[in-house]
Amino acid sequence: MHLSSAQDAQGHTPGTPHDEQFALAAELLALLGDRTRLALLHALTCGEADVTTLTEACGAARPAVSQHLARLRLAGLVTTRKEGRRVVYALRDGHLRRLVDEALNVADHRLSGRPVHD
């Protein structure tokens, strides 16, 4: 099979997202679409935190926070480590931190009426 120079071995044009990327991005955005999960991720943009700290930060009930954190962990968005009897959570990477920050910036611009920008 002959591939044009504008496509890779899988037939994708470089720089153009393919179906798997769109599907995974949609799953990620769906997880961010929940107010409590978004608040938890935002709290983690400041650094590591345990369930008690995260519960206080987002204002949800502790069982709900634990369930949301479990979903985020299973999705690979947060990491955990043990510190004595406590479990400490952290964002997996800076991409997620920037995505959360940008989502909140868009919301802030819409609520404040400030002009959009690049």
Language-model-detected regions and their locations in the chain:
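Amphipathic alpha-helical dimerization/coiled-coil segments
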Residues: 1-24, 42, 93-118
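Alpha-helical and His/Cys-centered functional microenvironments
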Residues: 6, 71-72
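N-terminal helix-turn-helix DNA-binding core of bacterial DNA-binding proteins
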Residues: 20-61, 87-95
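Residue-level detector of secondary-structure transition/capping positions
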Residues: 48-49, 73, 104
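Residues in the helix-turn-helix
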Residues: 64
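Residues within the DNA-recognition helix of helix-turn-helix
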Residues: 68
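Beta-hairpin "wing" of winged helix-turn-helix
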Residues: 73-83, 90
